[in-house]
Amino acid sequence: MQHLAVIMDGNGRWAKKHHLPRLAGHRAGAESLDRTMHWCKEAGIKYLTVYAFSTENWKRSKGEVAGLMKLLSHFIKSKEKELVKNGVRFRVIGRREDLSEKLQGEIAALEEKTKDGEFTLVVALSYGGRDEIIRAAKIFNAEARNRPLRGFATRGEANTPSEASAERRREHGESVEDEAVFSSCLDTAGIPDPDLIVRTSGELRISNFLLWQAAYAEFYFTDVLWPDFDKTEFDKAIASFSKRERRMGGRLK
């Protein structure tokens, strides 16, 4: 496995369980992320994507949203040296324009300083899978208008499909090339699709997370709240994945 994605759910319930304010749960969740990143590196996993803040989360109270943004800013400032030292590349996906200019600047600076890291931490922030697909479709369509149709002659040549193009269409229906081009328009361009998606807290849904990229991902659901996600639970998720036969839409021979 090279890419693990996590829906970090249960911070609020963890805080309530321990009679603490919700932001205390988010701080505990940040500590759990630190540990999980370390375990991923130990396991040889190259990419960790975490669902930190969705486009729907803006509907939460102003106090909680402000606290979450402050927590993220603190994470960026306090973890910079550690991420660089440990070879961790930091990357954010989502609607950056929704964030404050200050936070956008901090994110861009950390991405630049960690760009050579061999392990990649992807943080989904003000992110929604449907929104990402819509934005990608607009880019895809704009680029399509500026490039000739594949397999058709241009600039006065005969307007008939080439033999090679016709063969491609017969074998693949053009979907392989189209999918690759469309994928390059997504926020996750250059990042492999997740092999395993883990969701904590007992919820059995993906909540608008990586909808395009999750097409062939395996899923692991656990009742454990995110701040309580420990090495034992991490190992269970990895072990569950290792026992599965991934067909990727085809049949095993």
What are these regions (language model features)?
Residues 1-150, 163, 168, 173-253:
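Flexible, compositionally biased loop and terminal segments
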